[in-house]
Amino acid sequence: QGIWNDKLFPSWDSKYTCNINLEMNYWPSEVTNLSDLNEPLFRLIKEVSESGKETARIMYGANGWVLHHNTDIWRITGALDKAPSGMWPSGGAWLCRHLWERYLYTGDTEFLRSVYPILKGSGLFFDEIMVKEPVHNWLVVCPSNSPENVHSGNDGKATTAAGCTMDNQLIFD
């Protein structure tokens, strides 16, 4: 994809897939002392944290910001494509982990101060949209899904769920 794409209609529309693909490309950067390579990712995170405010407000009636499964050069943040992947609202939370990793590796408090509004906005979104699970009263993200995973439902296959483990871990982080 990117400059290597020779297709008029490329796979995934050449979007950034934020349910592991984009994140995985940057995992080695801090641990290999190549922190500067994160700058394009950090710019993307800042931009989707801005466009994601509108998505949070319109789709969820919530403050903060949200990024679903994909974004692109226009920094779209809403649910798109198919339900097994597109309805997942935790792409922004996962990308925030990269901001936190930068701080953990560098101890740069100025950097942390500069990205704190982004981290806070993602947390605020989840604080406002989580609901109580009816049996145990746990707070869970709903609706959600485990991206690209289809599970057995009452009447066949289902994708939308409440309290997916992936969401729980990302919010915990």
Model-derived regions: residue spans:
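Acidic/histidine-rich catalytic neighborhood
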Residues: 121-173
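Alpha-helical scaffold segments in carbohydrate-active enzymes
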Residues: 44-47, 51, 118-129
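Substrate-binding groove/exosite segments of carbohydrate-active enzymes
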Residues: 1-114
